[in-house]
């Protein structure tokens, strides 16, 4: 399996995260991508290539133009203030408050940011831009292989399912149409899915297996029927992002029925998780999905510091095998996973399970 990777992820190297009432070093940091890449190489998963640049058009196809402009200049504006730290949202437009965008950068950070664990630091925009290129390069490679019959997976045989791994960092599934948060700035998986739609793929499904609900992806496609969004995640009554991901959120207008949420309680083990996972796979099959995008978070792992599921490393092999059974061209887009010791093992287990 080909892996897409950019060294520019290192430009996103924030020093602070607000967690448990304290400013702590961020769980989402450059070592995550390094560890996954190291495992990809040590297991000889396949060739690792750099992304090509796709420009701004795919970003603006999904994200609000003023929001994108804010991300581009936020650090520059913040660094011109008297503040010494990183840009952390501290004041939001809550219930019955004006939804007008402030002029001052402190207000704009709160207007566009929905959670305070995610700061904007120097290099954030450049890293986010490269991360979406990683996702788009994977989508392009998968599309070309699908059109030409070229094999990009191993083993090289007629029955192998095509798969590509986009090692994105920063992650993206919490980034909404006009909001950042949850370590996410641009929605890599959504941008890739829309690019596939714009390039002739009629029916795309996004399967989100991250522990946290992908509120951003849901927000972007909630009123559409051409992109199916499915998510298994910690029950938002107990887990971030708290205000998105309930089972009765199924879409609106033309999109009714094209969103499928499976919130699960603390302590969920693989059997319970897998039963719901198989329901998602059945819906993907029934949707006549042409290309599958997997938001690949492995923070469902039992030792992850910011989740409460109990999946074990071997379970991730099973996840990959079950996805492969769909026999759909599949783009894996890296999302969360914060147990540094076994992060690489768990990610590559999914990919190896898919290819075995």
Q: What is each model feature region?
A:
Residues 1-207, 212-356:
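HDAC/HDAC-like amidohydrolase catalytic core signature
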